[in-house]
Design a protein with these regions (language model features):
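Hydrophobic N-terminal alpha-helices or hydrophobic patches in metabolic proteins across all domains
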Residues: 1-195
Length: 195
């Protein structure tokens, strides 16, 4: 890679990092607003029913990378290298439902236009599956950080790193979708002059 290409890549990465940091307060505030609405509507009870299933899936992911973990209901236990046990509580608000709401909101603007139904279905399925997988990986990362680096690192990642992951995922998802799944709208193409 030439120096000019490397410099362009570095500037792009810096610009993306700045964009993510600028969006972070907006997304965090939006998540808090969604949480308040969910509590008022009573959505927290059905979401809490999902927590034990997600906890067991996270334990499976952690076991796959060699971290000893166990789950019981909404509690999860991870052991560090010294054999000390760390208890984590996974609540209805930690499972990532807000990221699915953000994804749904992005569908409203991202699927405007005249795309074929097949492409729209692919976008929705890939987006939902990717977001759910990201949420599992995010919770597993919090647990792994608690087991390896301690509670402070896990809390910081839970509060801020997870939000950055979701925003980064949405950017990457829409770049991928626009490039490879959604066909270009013919009205966006420049017209050729005919004589």
């Amino acid at each position: 890679m030439r120096k000019q290409e490397r410099d362009a890549l570095n500037m792009t990465l810096i610009a993306l990092a700045c964009a993510l940091l600028m969006v972070l307060p907006l997304v965090t505030t939006f998540d808090d607003l969604l949480t308040a609405w969910a509590l008022q509507l009573g959505v927290n009870n059905p979401l809490q029913a999902i927590v034990p299933v997600e906890s067991r899936m996270v334990v499976g992911l952690l076991s796959a990378v060699g971290i000893k973990a166990a789950a019981s209901g909404s509690h999860m236990v991870v052991w560090d290298g010294a054999g000390s046990m760390h208890v984590l509580l996974i609540s209805w608000n930690c499972i990532g439902w807000q990221s699915l709401v953000l994804l749904g909101a992005s569908f409203i603007s991202g699927l405007r236009g005249h795309q074929p139904l097949e492409a729209r279905v692919q976008v929705v399925l890939i987006g939902a599956a990717g977001t759910m997988l990201l949420n599992l990986l995010r919770v597993a990362a919090v647990a792994a950080l608690a087991a390896t680096w301690g509670q402070t690192a896990a809390v910081l990642f839970h509060d801020y790193g997870g939000t950055l992951l979701v925003v980064g995922w949405l950017f990457a998802f829409w770049l991928f979708v626009q490039r490879w799944i959604l066909p270009a709208d013919p009205s966006d193409q420049p017209e050729l002059a005919t004589t």
